[in-house]
Design a protein with these regions (language model features):
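Phosphate-binding beta-alpha-beta segment of Rossmann-like dinucleotide-binding domains, i.e.
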Residues: 101-152, 164-167, 178
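An N-terminal-biased, well-structured beta-alpha scaffold segment characteristic
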Residues: 1-98
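Rossmann-like dinucleotide/phosphate-binding beta-alpha-beta segment
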Residues: 25, 138-215
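Conserved beta-strand edge residues that scaffold enzyme active sites
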Residues: 36-37, 104, 130, 183, ...
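Residue-level detector of anion-binding/catalytic polar loops
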Residues: 28-29, 96, 118, 122, ...
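Short gly/ser/thr-rich secondary-structure transition/capping motifs
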Residues: 33-38, 56-57, 132-141, 189-195
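Short beta-strand elements at the ligand-binding edges of bilobed clamshell
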Residues: 96-102, 195-198
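Short gly/pro/ser/thr-enriched loop/turn and capping motifs at secondary-structure boundaries
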Residues: 81-84, 104-107, 184
Length: 215
């Protein structure tokens, strides 16, 4: 829409077709390049008129940026986390900040299991052997790997993602132990997961999966 009466929203990155259709009906948009690590020069030129900012986690919404946006009314951060957004600075200006909690829980848990399976079954090593011509014939112990069934998985951080990993690992017949500073023991019981000190987890686990913030 080019109606100048509609609010101006800056979208930091080019997104797949159709993702912005609903937004397009309610505002004017200026959209940045696909792989931007910072706000493009073109978008910076529109900051004084912007009423909305739609960002990805590579864009720092900090004091320096906010000082250029006197009309800004909302920040929407397309990420579960919001470390890239200065919440205090936004709060002082009365600017609400939105994010997308939970959107990556299943995908991250699936990827965790995929990595664990690849490591346990030495899939990457075997694949490289086959591709590089080193594999010659079958062997009863060639790239044998390790069973997940019966192995102990230690999860550090039993939040949404850690719990989703536990659900999947239980289906593989793994024993689940976890360490968390504020454990939900009732939820853990439902997942057949045992809370243990971190030192015990490190000592007793066959696999360890971390699901905690960097801080």
């Amino acid at each position: 829409m080019n109606n100048s009466s509609l609010p101006l929203v800056l979208v930091s990155h080019t997104l797949p077709d159709g993702w912005l259709d609903n937004l397009e009906n309610h505002c004017r948009m200026v959209i940045g390049p696909k792989d931007a690590n910072e706000l493009s020069t073109e978008l910076e030129n529109f900051l004084p008129e912007a009423e909305g900012l739609f960002t990805l986690l590579t864009i720092n919404v900090n004091e320096a940026l906010l000082s250029k946006t006197p009309k800004l009314k909302v920040v929407s951060n397309m990420a579960v986390g919001y470390d890239n957004v200065d919440l205090d600075a936004c709060t002082q200006r009365g600017i609400p900040v939105g994010n997308t909690p939970g959107v990556l829980t299943d995908g991250t848990a699936d990827l965790t299991m995929a990595i664990m399976l690849a490591a346990a079954r030495r899939i990457i090593e075997a694949n490289l052997d086959a591709r590089q011509g080193r594999w010659k014939t079958w062997s009863p112990t060639g790239w044998l790997g390790k069973d997940l069934r019966g192995a102990t998985l230690g999860i550090i951080g039993m939040g949404q993602i850690g719990s989703a990993v536990a659900e999947r690992a239980t289906g593989f017949g793994m024993k689940i132990i976890f360490s968390d500073p504020d454990p939900d023991l009732e939820k853990a019981e439902g997942l057949k997961a045992k809370h243990v000190p971190l030192e015990t987890l490190i000592k007793d686990s066959d696999f360890i999966s971390l699901h905690i913030p960097l801080t």
